[in-house]
Amino acid sequence: MAEARIVLPPLKLASEIMKTMVTASCVNCEKLRFGLDTTRGLEVIEVEIPQRNPLDILLHNMLNILEGYREHVDRLGDVPILRQRMTGSDYDIFEEGLGVKLPGRREKWGGFYTSLLGYLREHLDEVKAGISTDGVTLGVEKGNFKLIFGGDLRLLRLLVSEGFYELGKFGGLKDVKSTGRPSLGIVEIRANGGVVALLTASLLALTAGSGSIGETDVYVISTMDIVGIEVRRLEAKFLTDVFRQFNSIIRDKSQYWMPVEDVDGMRLAALFEIYSRVGEEAEKVIGGRRVLESIRLNLSTFSPTGLRFYRREGFTISLGEVANLSSAMEAVGFTGWDKYKVASTIARLIISTLYLSKIASEQGLYKRLASDAKMLAYSIATEERRPYLDALYRLSRYLREEDVLWRIAQESSELIDEEHVESYIEDDYKGEKDRRKALLKSEAQRILRLLYHLVKQG
Protein backbone atom coordinates (compact mmCIF):
# COMPACT_ATOMS: atom_id res chain seq x y z
CA MET A 1 0.00 0.00 0.00
CA ALA A 2 1.53 3.31 -1.13
CA GLU A 3 1.00 6.57 0.75
CA ALA A 4 1.43 10.25 -0.02
CA ARG A 5 1.24 13.27 2.26
CA ILE A 6 -0.18 16.61 1.14
CA VAL A 7 0.55 19.78 3.12
CA LEU A 8 -2.28 22.33 3.17
CA PRO A 9 -1.89 26.13 3.18
CA PRO A 10 -2.77 27.62 6.61
CA LEU A 11 -5.50 29.74 5.00
CA LYS A 12 -9.12 28.78 5.64
CA LEU A 13 -10.46 29.02 2.10
CA ALA A 14 -7.36 27.55 0.42
CA SER A 15 -7.36 24.64 2.88
CA GLU A 16 -11.06 23.90 2.30
CA ILE A 17 -10.59 24.07 -1.48
CA MET A 18 -7.81 21.48 -1.30
CA LYS A 19 -9.81 19.20 1.01
CA THR A 20 -12.79 19.36 -1.34
CA MET A 21 -10.74 18.59 -4.44
CA VAL A 22 -8.67 15.81 -2.83
CA THR A 23 -11.81 14.07 -1.54
CA ALA A 24 -13.48 14.29 -4.96
CA SER A 25 -10.31 12.88 -6.58
CA CYS A 26 -10.11 9.88 -4.26
CA VAL A 27 -11.56 7.33 -6.70
CA ASN A 28 -8.56 5.01 -6.24
CA CYS A 29 -7.95 5.67 -2.55
CA GLU A 30 -8.31 3.19 0.27
CA LYS A 31 -8.24 5.91 2.92
CA LEU A 32 -7.83 9.64 3.46
CA ARG A 33 -6.55 10.85 6.82
CA PHE A 34 -7.09 14.52 7.66
CA GLY A 35 -4.67 15.46 10.40
CA LEU A 36 -1.98 17.79 11.67
CA ASP A 37 1.78 17.85 11.26
CA THR A 38 2.53 18.47 14.94
CA THR A 39 6.13 19.44 14.24
CA ARG A 40 5.19 22.38 12.03
CA GLY A 41 1.60 22.95 13.05
CA LEU A 42 0.26 22.56 9.50
CA GLU A 43 -2.78 20.58 8.36
CA VAL A 44 -2.00 17.57 6.18
CA ILE A 45 -3.90 14.94 4.20
CA GLU A 46 -2.45 11.44 4.10
CA VAL A 47 -3.58 9.56 0.99
CA GLU A 48 -3.47 5.76 0.88
CA ILE A 49 -3.70 4.21 -2.62
CA PRO A 50 -2.99 0.53 -3.45
CA GLN A 51 -0.78 1.49 -6.42
CA ARG A 52 2.62 3.01 -7.02
CA ASN A 53 2.99 6.80 -7.28
CA PRO A 54 -0.19 7.68 -5.34
CA LEU A 55 0.27 11.44 -5.66
CA ASP A 56 0.55 11.17 -9.46
CA ILE A 57 -2.70 9.22 -9.56
CA LEU A 58 -4.49 11.68 -7.28
CA LEU A 59 -3.35 14.75 -9.24
CA HIS A 60 -4.37 13.23 -12.58
CA ASN A 61 -7.80 12.47 -11.12
CA MET A 62 -8.01 16.06 -9.89
CA LEU A 63 -7.09 17.43 -13.31
CA ASN A 64 -9.82 15.31 -14.92
CA ILE A 65 -12.37 16.67 -12.44
CA LEU A 66 -11.30 20.26 -13.14
CA GLU A 67 -11.70 19.61 -16.88
CA GLY A 68 -15.38 18.91 -16.21
CA TYR A 69 -15.90 22.46 -14.90
CA ARG A 70 -14.98 24.22 -18.18
CA GLU A 71 -18.55 25.08 -19.18
CA HIS A 72 -19.43 26.20 -15.67
CA VAL A 73 -16.49 28.61 -15.51
CA ASP A 74 -17.31 29.94 -18.97
CA ARG A 75 -20.85 30.72 -17.78
CA LEU A 76 -19.68 32.68 -14.72
CA GLY A 77 -20.33 36.38 -15.11
CA ASP A 78 -17.23 37.24 -13.11
CA VAL A 79 -14.69 35.52 -10.88
CA PRO A 80 -12.75 36.65 -7.77
CA ILE A 81 -9.52 37.59 -9.55
CA LEU A 82 -8.14 41.14 -9.46
CA ARG A 83 -7.03 41.71 -13.06
CA GLN A 84 -6.05 45.39 -12.90
CA ARG A 85 -2.60 46.08 -14.31
CA MET A 86 -1.17 47.47 -11.10
CA THR A 87 1.32 46.45 -8.45
CA GLY A 88 -0.20 44.04 -5.96
CA SER A 89 -3.08 42.82 -8.14
CA ASP A 90 -3.37 39.27 -9.49
CA TYR A 91 -2.31 40.41 -12.97
CA ASP A 92 1.41 39.81 -12.48
CA ILE A 93 0.85 36.29 -11.09
CA PHE A 94 -0.66 35.05 -14.33
CA GLU A 95 0.66 37.18 -17.17
CA GLU A 96 4.19 37.52 -15.81
CA GLY A 97 4.54 34.51 -13.49
CA LEU A 98 2.66 31.81 -15.43
CA GLY A 99 2.44 33.36 -18.87
CA VAL A 100 -1.34 32.86 -18.89
CA LYS A 101 -3.27 35.79 -20.35
CA LEU A 102 -6.18 37.22 -18.37
CA PRO A 103 -9.38 37.96 -20.33
CA GLY A 104 -10.52 41.47 -21.18
CA ARG A 105 -13.42 43.12 -19.39
CA ARG A 106 -16.01 41.82 -21.87
CA GLU A 107 -14.47 38.41 -22.45
CA LYS A 108 -15.60 35.21 -20.74
CA TRP A 109 -13.36 33.28 -18.38
CA GLY A 110 -13.51 29.95 -20.22
CA GLY A 111 -10.44 30.66 -22.35
CA PHE A 112 -8.38 31.67 -19.32
CA TYR A 113 -9.50 28.54 -17.45
CA THR A 114 -8.54 26.34 -20.41
CA SER A 115 -5.09 27.96 -20.57
CA LEU A 116 -4.69 27.54 -16.82
CA LEU A 117 -5.49 23.82 -17.06
CA GLY A 118 -2.99 23.52 -19.91
CA TYR A 119 -0.31 25.06 -17.71
CA LEU A 120 -1.29 22.78 -14.84
CA ARG A 121 -1.14 19.67 -17.02
CA GLU A 122 2.44 20.51 -18.01
CA HIS A 123 3.54 21.32 -14.45
CA LEU A 124 2.10 18.49 -12.34
CA ASP A 125 5.62 17.67 -11.17
CA GLU A 126 5.80 21.19 -9.70
CA VAL A 127 2.55 20.59 -7.85
CA LYS A 128 3.91 17.33 -6.40
CA ALA A 129 7.06 19.08 -5.23
CA GLY A 130 5.20 22.09 -3.85
CA ILE A 131 2.62 20.30 -1.70
CA SER A 132 4.77 17.41 -0.44
CA THR A 133 6.25 17.39 3.05
CA ASP A 134 9.78 17.82 1.70
CA GLY A 135 8.79 20.64 -0.65
CA VAL A 136 7.25 22.91 2.00
CA THR A 137 9.67 25.08 3.95
CA LEU A 138 8.99 27.58 6.70
CA GLY A 139 10.96 30.06 8.74
CA VAL A 140 11.12 33.59 10.10
CA GLU A 141 12.86 36.26 8.04
CA LYS A 142 13.09 39.91 9.13
CA GLY A 143 10.25 39.38 11.58
CA ASN A 144 8.00 37.83 8.92
CA PHE A 145 6.78 34.27 8.98
CA LYS A 146 7.51 32.72 5.54
CA LEU A 147 5.87 29.56 4.28
CA ILE A 148 7.07 28.39 0.86
CA PHE A 149 5.24 25.80 -1.24
CA GLY A 150 8.08 25.13 -3.65
CA GLY A 151 8.39 28.58 -5.25
CA ASP A 152 8.22 32.35 -4.95
CA LEU A 153 4.91 33.35 -6.59
CA ARG A 154 2.20 35.07 -4.56
CA LEU A 155 -1.13 33.32 -4.16
CA LEU A 156 -4.36 34.94 -5.33
CA ARG A 157 -5.41 38.04 -3.39
CA LEU A 158 -8.62 36.32 -2.33
CA LEU A 159 -6.68 33.49 -0.70
CA VAL A 160 -4.07 35.63 1.05
CA SER A 161 -6.66 38.19 2.19
CA GLU A 162 -7.39 35.71 4.95
CA GLY A 163 -3.77 36.01 6.09
CA PHE A 164 -3.19 37.92 9.30
CA TYR A 165 -0.99 40.03 11.53
CA GLU A 166 -0.49 38.60 14.99
CA LEU A 167 1.84 38.80 17.97
CA GLY A 168 2.51 35.30 19.20
CA LYS A 169 1.81 31.95 17.63
CA PHE A 170 0.78 33.00 14.11
CA GLY A 171 -2.77 31.72 14.54
CA GLY A 172 -1.80 28.20 15.58
CA LEU A 173 1.41 27.89 13.53
CA LYS A 174 4.44 27.28 15.69
CA ASP A 175 7.02 30.03 15.93
CA VAL A 176 10.28 28.43 14.79
CA LYS A 177 12.38 30.56 17.17
CA SER A 178 13.63 28.37 20.01
CA THR A 179 14.35 31.22 22.42
CA GLY A 180 13.21 34.76 23.12
CA ARG A 181 9.86 36.46 22.61
CA PRO A 182 7.66 35.60 19.61
CA SER A 183 8.26 37.56 16.43
CA LEU A 184 5.95 40.37 15.37
CA GLY A 185 5.29 40.22 11.65
CA ILE A 186 3.17 39.07 8.78
CA VAL A 187 2.52 35.61 7.43
CA GLU A 188 3.88 35.47 3.89
CA ILE A 189 2.92 32.46 1.79
CA ARG A 190 4.54 31.76 -1.58
CA ALA A 191 4.24 28.87 -4.03
CA ASN A 192 5.50 27.59 -7.35
CA GLY A 193 3.54 27.98 -10.58
CA GLY A 194 1.98 24.53 -10.44
CA VAL A 195 0.54 25.05 -6.96
CA VAL A 196 -0.74 28.53 -7.88
CA ALA A 197 -2.40 27.12 -11.03
CA LEU A 198 -4.01 24.26 -9.08
CA LEU A 199 -5.40 26.53 -6.36
CA THR A 200 -6.67 29.06 -8.91
CA ALA A 201 -8.34 26.48 -11.16
CA SER A 202 -9.95 24.82 -8.13
CA LEU A 203 -11.19 28.17 -6.83
CA LEU A 204 -12.82 28.99 -10.18
CA ALA A 205 -14.42 25.55 -10.36
CA LEU A 206 -15.91 25.97 -6.87
CA THR A 207 -17.13 29.54 -7.47
CA ALA A 208 -20.89 28.99 -7.54
CA GLY A 209 -21.80 32.45 -8.78
CA SER A 210 -21.25 36.17 -8.64
CA GLY A 211 -23.47 39.20 -8.36
CA SER A 212 -23.74 42.50 -6.56
CA ILE A 213 -25.38 44.20 -3.62
CA GLY A 214 -25.73 47.84 -4.53
CA GLU A 215 -22.36 48.80 -6.00
CA THR A 216 -20.46 45.99 -4.29
CA ASP A 217 -19.42 42.82 -6.14
CA VAL A 218 -20.05 39.56 -4.30
CA TYR A 219 -18.65 36.08 -5.03
CA VAL A 220 -20.19 32.85 -3.72
CA ILE A 221 -17.90 29.84 -3.17
CA SER A 222 -18.89 26.39 -1.92
CA THR A 223 -16.42 24.05 -0.19
CA MET A 224 -16.25 21.11 2.19
CA ASP A 225 -14.28 21.03 5.44
CA ILE A 226 -13.00 17.85 7.08
CA VAL A 227 -10.89 17.98 10.23
CA GLY A 228 -9.08 15.30 12.22
CA ILE A 229 -10.78 12.15 10.91
CA GLU A 230 -10.15 9.21 8.59
CA VAL A 231 -12.33 8.78 5.51
CA ARG A 232 -12.61 5.44 3.74
CA ARG A 233 -13.06 4.89 0.01
CA LEU A 234 -16.86 4.44 -0.07
CA GLU A 235 -17.26 7.27 2.41
CA ALA A 236 -15.21 9.53 0.13
CA LYS A 237 -17.53 8.57 -2.73
CA PHE A 238 -20.54 9.45 -0.58
CA LEU A 239 -19.01 12.77 0.48
CA THR A 240 -18.25 13.63 -3.13
CA ASP A 241 -21.89 13.01 -4.07
CA VAL A 242 -23.15 15.07 -1.13
CA PHE A 243 -20.90 17.97 -2.07
CA ARG A 244 -21.93 17.70 -5.73
CA GLN A 245 -25.57 18.01 -4.69
CA PHE A 246 -24.80 20.93 -2.36
CA ASN A 247 -22.85 22.73 -5.08
CA SER A 248 -25.60 22.23 -7.65
CA ILE A 249 -28.21 23.57 -5.21
CA ILE A 250 -26.16 26.71 -4.59
CA ARG A 251 -25.52 27.20 -8.29
CA ASP A 252 -29.16 26.61 -9.26
CA LYS A 253 -30.68 28.73 -6.52
CA SER A 254 -28.17 31.55 -6.90
CA GLN A 255 -30.18 32.73 -9.90
CA TYR A 256 -32.39 34.29 -7.20
CA TRP A 257 -29.32 35.63 -5.39
CA MET A 258 -30.44 34.47 -1.98
CA PRO A 259 -26.99 33.32 -0.77
CA VAL A 260 -26.05 36.88 0.12
CA GLU A 261 -29.43 38.57 0.48
CA ASP A 262 -30.86 36.05 2.96
CA VAL A 263 -28.22 33.72 4.34
CA ASP A 264 -30.54 32.08 6.90
CA GLY A 265 -33.16 31.35 4.26
CA MET A 266 -30.63 29.89 1.86
CA ARG A 267 -29.14 27.73 4.59
CA LEU A 268 -32.50 26.23 5.55
CA ALA A 269 -33.48 25.69 1.92
CA ALA A 270 -30.14 24.02 1.19
CA LEU A 271 -30.42 21.80 4.30
CA PHE A 272 -33.87 20.50 3.37
CA GLU A 273 -33.01 20.10 -0.33
CA ILE A 274 -29.79 18.20 0.43
CA TYR A 275 -31.75 15.94 2.77
CA SER A 276 -34.33 15.28 0.06
CA ARG A 277 -31.55 14.11 -2.28
CA VAL A 278 -29.14 12.20 -0.03
CA GLY A 279 -31.01 11.78 3.25
CA GLU A 280 -31.60 8.05 2.94
CA GLU A 281 -27.94 7.29 2.23
CA ALA A 282 -26.79 9.80 4.87
CA GLU A 283 -28.74 7.91 7.54
CA LYS A 284 -26.96 4.67 6.60
CA VAL A 285 -23.43 6.03 6.15
CA ILE A 286 -23.38 8.41 9.10
CA GLY A 287 -25.38 6.06 11.31
CA GLY A 288 -22.57 3.55 10.87
CA ARG A 289 -19.80 6.07 11.65
CA ARG A 290 -20.94 8.99 13.78
CA VAL A 291 -17.52 10.66 13.43
CA LEU A 292 -18.59 11.75 9.93
CA GLU A 293 -21.24 14.05 11.47
CA SER A 294 -18.58 16.73 11.96
CA ILE A 295 -17.90 17.14 8.22
CA ARG A 296 -19.17 20.52 7.06
CA LEU A 297 -20.52 21.92 3.81
CA ASN A 298 -19.58 25.60 3.67
CA LEU A 299 -20.90 28.48 1.65
CA SER A 300 -18.58 31.49 1.75
CA THR A 301 -19.15 34.93 0.25
CA PHE A 302 -16.50 37.56 -0.46
CA SER A 303 -16.35 41.12 -1.75
CA PRO A 304 -13.34 43.05 -3.04
CA THR A 305 -12.09 46.27 -1.52
CA GLY A 306 -9.03 47.81 -3.10
CA LEU A 307 -6.40 45.11 -3.50
CA ARG A 308 -7.91 42.64 -1.07
CA PHE A 309 -11.14 40.80 -0.31
CA TYR A 310 -13.19 40.60 2.85
CA ARG A 311 -15.35 37.71 3.98
CA ARG A 312 -19.07 38.38 4.16
CA GLU A 313 -21.70 36.34 5.95
CA GLY A 314 -21.96 32.71 4.85
CA PHE A 315 -23.25 29.49 6.34
CA THR A 316 -22.28 25.95 7.31
CA ILE A 317 -24.28 22.71 7.22
CA SER A 318 -22.89 19.69 9.06
CA LEU A 319 -23.60 16.18 7.83
CA GLY A 320 -24.95 15.47 11.29
CA GLU A 321 -27.73 17.99 10.65
CA VAL A 322 -28.58 16.32 7.36
CA ALA A 323 -28.79 12.84 8.91
CA ASN A 324 -30.72 14.06 11.97
CA LEU A 325 -33.42 15.65 9.81
CA SER A 326 -34.95 12.17 9.41
CA SER A 327 -36.04 11.97 13.04
CA ALA A 328 -37.26 15.57 12.87
CA MET A 329 -39.44 14.80 9.83
CA GLU A 330 -40.78 11.66 11.51
CA ALA A 331 -41.64 13.73 14.59
CA VAL A 332 -44.16 15.68 12.49
CA GLY A 333 -45.63 12.56 10.92
CA PHE A 334 -43.70 12.02 7.68
CA THR A 335 -42.33 8.55 6.96
CA GLY A 336 -40.78 6.60 4.09
CA TRP A 337 -40.29 8.45 0.82
CA ASP A 338 -42.66 11.20 1.97
CA LYS A 339 -39.87 12.52 4.23
CA TYR A 340 -37.67 13.32 1.26
CA LYS A 341 -40.41 14.61 -1.07
CA VAL A 342 -41.83 16.93 1.59
CA ALA A 343 -38.36 18.23 2.48
CA SER A 344 -37.90 19.31 -1.14
CA THR A 345 -41.29 21.05 -1.11
CA ILE A 346 -40.26 22.96 2.04
CA ALA A 347 -37.00 24.04 0.37
CA ARG A 348 -38.84 25.37 -2.69
CA LEU A 349 -41.42 27.12 -0.50
CA ILE A 350 -38.62 29.04 1.25
CA ILE A 351 -36.88 30.04 -1.98
CA SER A 352 -40.07 31.06 -3.82
CA THR A 353 -41.38 33.24 -0.98
CA LEU A 354 -37.97 34.87 -0.56
CA TYR A 355 -37.84 35.62 -4.27
CA LEU A 356 -41.35 37.09 -4.27
CA SER A 357 -40.45 39.22 -1.25
CA LYS A 358 -37.88 40.94 -3.52
CA ILE A 359 -39.86 41.36 -6.75
CA ALA A 360 -43.61 41.21 -6.08
CA SER A 361 -45.70 44.37 -5.79
CA GLU A 362 -47.03 43.06 -2.45
CA GLN A 363 -43.55 42.81 -0.96
CA GLY A 364 -44.77 43.23 2.61
CA LEU A 365 -47.03 40.19 2.35
CA TYR A 366 -44.35 37.96 0.86
CA LYS A 367 -41.76 39.12 3.38
CA ARG A 368 -44.08 37.89 6.14
CA LEU A 369 -44.68 34.63 4.28
CA ALA A 370 -40.94 34.15 3.70
CA SER A 371 -40.28 34.73 7.39
CA ASP A 372 -42.96 32.20 8.32
CA ALA A 373 -41.68 29.63 5.80
CA LYS A 374 -38.20 29.92 7.34
CA MET A 375 -39.60 29.68 10.86
CA LEU A 376 -41.61 26.61 9.92
CA ALA A 377 -38.52 24.90 8.48
CA TYR A 378 -36.40 25.90 11.47
CA SER A 379 -39.00 24.60 13.91
CA ILE A 380 -39.23 21.26 12.12
CA ALA A 381 -35.43 20.89 11.99
CA THR A 382 -34.99 21.73 15.68
CA GLU A 383 -38.25 20.13 16.86
CA GLU A 384 -39.35 23.33 18.63
CA ARG A 385 -43.14 23.31 18.51
CA ARG A 386 -44.26 26.79 19.51
CA PRO A 387 -42.78 28.86 16.66
CA TYR A 388 -43.87 26.01 14.35
CA LEU A 389 -47.53 26.49 15.29
CA ASP A 390 -47.44 30.28 15.01
CA ALA A 391 -45.81 30.18 11.56
CA LEU A 392 -48.13 27.41 10.38
CA TYR A 393 -51.22 29.40 11.39
CA ARG A 394 -50.16 32.46 9.40
CA LEU A 395 -49.09 30.47 6.32
CA SER A 396 -52.36 28.53 6.29
CA ARG A 397 -54.40 31.72 6.58
CA TYR A 398 -52.65 33.58 3.74
CA LEU A 399 -52.48 30.60 1.39
CA ARG A 400 -56.24 30.24 1.48
CA GLU A 401 -56.16 33.16 -0.95
CA GLU A 402 -55.95 31.52 -4.37
CA ASP A 403 -53.90 34.24 -6.07
CA VAL A 404 -51.23 34.06 -3.33
CA LEU A 405 -51.06 30.26 -3.52
CA TRP A 406 -50.77 30.24 -7.31
CA ARG A 407 -48.12 32.95 -7.32
CA ILE A 408 -45.98 30.95 -4.89
CA ALA A 409 -46.64 27.69 -6.76
CA GLN A 410 -45.59 29.37 -10.01
CA GLU A 411 -42.22 30.44 -8.62
CA SER A 412 -41.76 27.16 -6.78
CA SER A 413 -42.39 25.08 -9.91
CA GLU A 414 -39.78 27.12 -11.80
CA LEU A 415 -37.17 25.64 -9.44
CA ILE A 416 -37.81 22.13 -10.77
CA ASP A 417 -35.42 21.06 -13.53
CA GLU A 418 -37.03 20.53 -16.92
CA GLU A 419 -35.68 16.98 -17.10
CA HIS A 420 -37.47 16.05 -13.87
CA VAL A 421 -40.85 17.67 -14.58
CA GLU A 422 -42.70 14.37 -15.22
CA SER A 423 -41.72 12.92 -11.87
CA TYR A 424 -43.11 16.01 -10.10
CA ILE A 425 -46.56 15.86 -11.72
CA GLU A 426 -49.13 14.40 -9.33
CA ASP A 427 -51.41 11.54 -10.43
CA ASP A 428 -54.44 13.86 -10.51
CA TYR A 429 -52.87 15.86 -13.36
CA LYS A 430 -51.04 13.16 -15.37
CA GLY A 431 -53.61 13.39 -18.17
CA GLU A 432 -53.23 17.13 -18.84
CA LYS A 433 -51.63 18.06 -22.18
CA ASP A 434 -49.96 21.22 -20.89
CA ARG A 435 -47.17 19.76 -18.76
CA ARG A 436 -46.10 23.06 -17.21
CA LYS A 437 -49.69 23.76 -16.18
CA ALA A 438 -49.93 20.25 -14.74
CA LEU A 439 -46.72 20.89 -12.82
CA LEU A 440 -48.08 24.19 -11.47
CA LYS A 441 -51.26 22.51 -10.22
CA SER A 442 -49.20 19.70 -8.71
CA GLU A 443 -46.97 22.15 -6.85
CA ALA A 444 -49.96 24.02 -5.45
CA GLN A 445 -51.41 20.70 -4.31
CA ARG A 446 -48.14 19.71 -2.62
CA ILE A 447 -47.95 23.00 -0.72
CA LEU A 448 -51.54 22.69 0.52
CA ARG A 449 -51.05 19.04 1.48
CA LEU A 450 -47.96 19.99 3.46
CA LEU A 451 -49.82 22.66 5.40
CA TYR A 452 -52.94 20.53 5.97
CA HIS A 453 -50.82 17.65 7.24
CA LEU A 454 -48.94 19.89 9.67
CA VAL A 455 -52.17 21.51 10.89
CA LYS A 456 -53.56 18.06 11.71
CA GLN A 457 -50.30 17.13 13.46
CA GLY A 458 -50.34 20.37 15.44
Stretches found by the model and what they are:
Residues M1-D125, A129-I131, E280-G458:
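Long, contiguous all-alpha helical interaction modules
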